[in-house]
Amino acid sequence: MKLLENSSFEAINSQLTVETGDAHIIGRIESYSCKMAGDDKHMFKQFCQEGQPHVLEALSPPQTSGLSPSRLSKSQGGEDESPLSDKCSRKTLFYLIATLNESFRPDYDFSTARSHEFSREPSLRWVVNAVNCSLFSAVREDFKALKPQLWNAVDEEICLAECDIYSYNPDLDSDPFGEDGSLWSFNYFFYNKRLKRIVFFSCRSISGSTYTPSEAGNALDLELGAEEVDEESGGGGGGGEGRAEETSTMEEDRVPVICM
C-alpha cells in the first residue's frame, strides 16, 4: 500500500483537528494505492498461507445500522438477492489490514486482525449520514461549510458510486482509539476495485479532561514537517530535488477518476 498525495485531503485534515471545549476531534482522510510494495508482497504471501486470496471470509454485521447488507437486501426485495454480501475475499481483507498498518505505523500493528473485526456497510447513504451526524454533533455550525468540501474531495478521489465501503470495529484490546476518555470513533474504507485504490477516513473524539497534546500526533507532525520544509528551502541544497522526485513517483501510481 502506498500513500497518495492529495492536497484537498491535506487541507480538509487541518480542519478535522478541532477543540470544542469539552472534547477534541482528531480526524484524517488518506488515499492509498493497492499496488503492493516489497513489504506488502511478503506479508501477502504469509497471509495467503491461511487461505487462498479468493476464499471468502465472514464479516461482522455493520454497526452503522441494525441490518447487515444481506438482511437489508432480503427485507427490501423479498428475497435474499445477495447471500454473500456479509463476506469479502481474503485479498480484499488483506488490503484493509495493510491500509491500517500503513496509516497507523509505527504505533500499531494490525497484521493479526481478523475478518470479524470488519464490516461491509449497507450503502453510501448510511455511511454519509453516520459521518455527518458524528461530526455535526461535535463541531456544529463549523461542519456545515466543511461538509460539501469533504464529500466532493472524497468523490473526486475515489468515485463513491463505485465503492464498496467497509468499517473497522475492533474489540477494546485491539482498538487504537480505545483509550480512556474516548467518546466515539469511526474507521471507514472506501474501496474502488477498478481504480485499485482505498480512501481511508478515520476520526475520533476524546474527552477534554483526558486529552493531552500528544494525542494530536498527526496534526503536530504536519506542523513540524512544514517548519522543516521552510528551513530546508531557505538553506538551498538538493533537498527540494529529492522531494520533487518522490512526488513524481507518487503521481505515477495515480490514475484519473472517471465515474461511469
UniProtKB/Swiss-Prot annotation:
InterPro entries: Maf1 (IPR015257), Maf1_sf (IPR038564). Residues 58-85, 227-255 are annotated as: Disordered. Residues 61-76 have a biased composition (Polar residues). One of its GO terms (molecular function) is RNA polymerase III core binding. The modification Phosphoserine is found at S60, S65, S68, S70, S75, S214. GO terms for cellular component: axon; cytoplasm; cytosol; dendrite; inhibitory synapse; nucleoplasm; nucleus; perinuclear region of cytoplasm. Plays a role in the repression of RNA polymerase III-mediated transcription in response to changing nutritional, environmental and cellular stress conditions to balance the production of highly abundant tRNAs, 5S rRNA, and other small non-coding RNAs with cell growth and maintenance. Also plays a key role in cell fate determination by promoting mesorderm induction and adipocyte differentiation. Mechanistically, associates with the RNA polymerase III clamp and thereby impairs its recruitment to the complex made of the promoter DNA, TBP and the initiation factor TFIIIB. It is found in: Nucleus; Cytoplasm. Keywords: Cytoplasm, Isopeptide bond, Nucleus, Phosphoprotein, Repressor, Transcription, Transcription regulation, Ubl conjugation. GO terms for biological process: negative regulation of transcription by RNA polymerase I; negative regulation of transcription by RNA polymerase III. Phosphorylated at Ser-60, Ser-68 and Ser-75; the major sites of phosphorylation. Nuclear accumulation correlates with a concomitant dephosphorylation. Phosphorylation may attenuate its RNA polymerase III-repressive function. Sumoylated with SUMO1 and SUMO2, mainly on Lys-35. Desumoylated by SENP1. SUMOylation promotes the ability of MAF1 to repress transcription and suppress colony formation. This is Repressor of RNA polymerase III transcription MAF1 homolog. The modification Phosphothreonine is found at T64, T212. Gene3D superfamilies: Repressor of RNA polymerase III transcription Maf1. Belongs to the MAF1 family. Interacts with TFIIIB subunits BRF1 and BRF2. Interacts with Pol III subunit POLR3F. Interacts with TFIIIC subunit GTF3C1. Residues 242-255 have a biased composition (Basic and acidic residues). There is a cross-link at K35 (Glycyl lysine isopeptide (Lys-Gly) (interchain with G-Cter in SUMO1 and SUMO2)).
